[in-house]
Design a protein with these regions (language model features):
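ATP-dependent adenylation/nucleotidyltransferase module used to activate substrates
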Residues: 1-159
Length: 159
């Protein structure tokens, strides 16, 4: 008997790439996933929520929807998910004619996506209380749908 406990989790953005991975897992084209987790910013287009409902209707691997709150509300309040500093979204500054346009600093992916999914894995999948260590012999593989043109966004495996 193996002492290794494995979990296979799909970070589901409900876009083309993560949807393809979800469907491939449903049909056995890739390793089966135990859960798909959608981090809801509360500001996704209606078509994303409709698509998410369609995916759920396929009765494939369970899809968890988790949220850190509504990004737009935090932006209007000038606060982030912890109630401190600013809510940083990806946006661009408007420039006068001929001037260079810049992008503001952004952190929403970390606060509204990455941390939400990591918390769901730790609490909902592994059943861990906050600040508890993952038990020895437990391995979590996360699947991300990233296309070739987005490869610079991909990061290496971390222990």
């Amino acid at each position: 008997m193996s002492s290794l406990t494995e979990y296979h989790i799909l970070n589901l953005g409900a876009g083309v790439q993560s949807t393809a991975l979800y469907l491939m897992a449903c049909t056995g084209e890739i390793h089966a996933i135990d859960h798909a987790i959608f981090a809801d910013t509360g500001e996704e287009p209606g078509a994303v929520y409709k698509h998410l409902e369609w995916l759920k209707s396929l009765n494939g691997p369970p899809i968890m929807v988790r949220s850190a709150g509504k990004l737009g509300d935090d932006l209007r309040r000038g606060r982030n998910t912890t109630g401190g500093r600013f809510a940083a979204i990806p946006c661009f500054t408007q420039a006068e004619a001929g001037a260079e346009v810049g992008r503001t600093r952004r952190q929403c992916s970390k606060e509204y996506k990455t941390e939400v999914i990591e918390r769901a894995i730790r609490r909902d999948v592994l059943g861990l209380d906050p600040r508890k260590r993952i038990p020895k012999g437990t391995h979590v593989s996360q699947y991300f749908g990233i296309s070739w043109d987005e490869r610079s966004r991909a990061s290496r495996t971390r222990p």
